[in-house]
Swiss-Prot record:
NCBIfam families (UniProt xref): PRK04208.1
Main location: plastid
This protein's name: Ribulose bisphosphate carboxylase large chain
Function, in words: RuBisCO catalyzes two reactions: the carboxylation of D-ribulose 1,5-bisphosphate, the primary event in carbon dioxide fixation, as well as the oxidative fragmentation of the pentose substrate in the photorespiration process. Both reactions occur simultaneously and in competition at the same active site.
PTM text: The disulfide bond which can form in the large chain dimeric partners within the hexadecamer appears to be associated with oxidative stress and protein turnover.
């Protein structure tokens, strides 16, 4: 009784412009490009329906639950200025649609099948508001910024890193030697490249051993705590944990994971292991551009960054603003703040669609990496501030005198920039002069 079969417009149930969002709702901002002839209200409602409780037709089992309680709602639409037939659709999802502590489940719903939907030419998730009621169900980063500084005993400046190159092809012994040279020269960290896992020319266990030797030797010589991001990414979760465990047994302070290729389930598993065992966790974002590079389809990196803060990681690559990889300055700074700060106000000029309150979830250090070198140090110090990791790969190893002098050059330049900034000098204007003085 009361059930009427047939296909209905989504907007009859899922477009609700008078809906008042709740504190506990997960809010999403989608950039939609509807197919010609599809009204934006229908497209927005379709997104809300297909990413929550809806399907293409009315089904009798709808009567067995309270759809009003569980459905996603498109509660606002705005045309994108300067773009033809593009709209921002705001969708509110009730909290009960999602499993607690699972980024995997969150993404399966919100960025699942709906992205292949016929009524849309393109769809991009621009931002998500994660309410405290949901974020409190996650452990988040294993340690966070303050605990990391305390573990490393390094304060008042950005941390320095370097990716060992050539990224593939070195033997474990030569790899360890390159690590030692860089750390001895003054870097805080060296890094496995994201595609170094356990290949025929260098098996993971051999690499871990020679790197541990380099760590202990450079620590003894410099009196500073040193780290190398040992990449634990593997084909199975069990193998990944085996590698992390061996790193812990060797006394290494930090391991690494490729969180998008490894997957959120594996990443969250590793983040829990790292907190339980006192390891820091460095996150690389290989594959992100497949998802975030198109301006009208996919997902913005700020969403992937928020997802990582929930899933867990102490460092994450965040572009550079100045190097070889793409990144717009204000927008990059927007998601850098979303990674580090506890409370971030809505600010559309920086691409932040919602005010985000992380409550007590620890912060993540943004890593600037990709085509940067010594002459970028003033700009990077100014843009990223102290709570960041600056990673010069070719910018260290490409030094004409070798790795250790390259590392010395980076450390000297960084300390000169930090000192000049602390003395009130204008790095944007005087940066090159500051570095020239430091080299004398």
């Amino acid at each position: 009784v009361g059930f009427k079969a047939g296909v209905k417009d989504y907007r009859l149930n899922y477009y609700t412009p008078d809906y008042q969002t709740k504190e506990t709702d997960i809010l999403a901002a989608f950039r939609m490009t509807p197919q010609p002839g599809v009204p934006p209200e229908e497209a927005g409602a379709a997104v809300a329906a297909e990413s929550s409780t809806g399907t293409w037709t009315t089904v009798w089992t709808d009567g067995l639950t309270s759809l009003d309680r569980y459905k996603g709602r498109c509660y606002d639409l705005e045309a994108v200025p300067g773009e033809e037939n593009q709209y921002i659709a705001y969708v509110a999802y009730p909290l009960d649609l999602f499993e607690e502590g699972s980024v995997t489940n969150l993404f399966t719903s919100i960025v699942g099948n709906v992205f292949g939907f016929k009524a849309l030419r393109a769809l991009r998730l621009e931002d998500l508001r994660i309410p405290p009621a949901y974020s409190k169900t996650f452990q988040g980063p294993p340690h966070g910024i303050q605990v990391e500084r305390d573990k490393l005993n390094k304060y008042g400046r950005p941390l320095l890193g370097c990716t060992i190159k050539p990224k593939l092809g070195l033997s474990a012994k030569n790899y360890g030697r390159a690590v030692y040279e860089c750390l001895r020269g003054g870097l805080d960290f060296t890094k496995d490249d994201e595609n170094v896992n356990s290949q025929p020319f260098m098996r993971w266990r051999d690499r871990f051993l020679f790197v541990a030797e380099a760590l202990y030797k450079s620590q003894a010589e410099t009196g500073e705590i040193k780290g190398h991001y040992l990449n634990a990414t593997a084909g199975t979760c069990e193998e990944m944990l085996k590698r992390a465990e061996f790193a812990r047994e060797l006394g290494a302070p930090i391991v690494m994971h490729d969180y998008l290729t490894g997957g959120f389930t594996a990443n969250t598993t590793l983040a829990h292991y790292c907190r339980d065992n006192g390891l820091l966790l460095h996150i690389h974002r290989a594959m992100h551009a497949v998802i975030d590079r198109q301006k009208n389809h996919g997902m913005h990196f700020r969403v992937l960054a928020k997802a990582l803060r929930l899933s867990g990681g102490d460092h994450i690559h965040a572009g550079t603003v100045v190097g070889k990889l793409e990144g717009e300055r204000q927008v990059t700074l927007g998601f850098v703040d979303l990674l580090r700060d506890d409370y971030i106000e809505k600010d559309r000029s920086r691409g932040i669609y919602f005010t985000q309150d992380w409550v007590s979830l620890p912060g993540v250090l943004p890593v600037a990496s990709g085509g940067i070198h010594v002459w970028h140090x003033p700009a990077l110090t100014e843009i990223f501030g102290d709570d960041s990791v600056l990673q010069f790969g070719g910018g260290t190893l490409g030094h004409p005198w070798g790795n250790a002098p390259g590392a010395v050059a980076n450390r000297v330049a960084l300390e000169a920039c930090v000192q000049a900034r602390n003395e009130g000098r204008d790095l944007a204007r005087e940066g090159n002069e500051v570095i020239r003085e430091a080299t004398k």
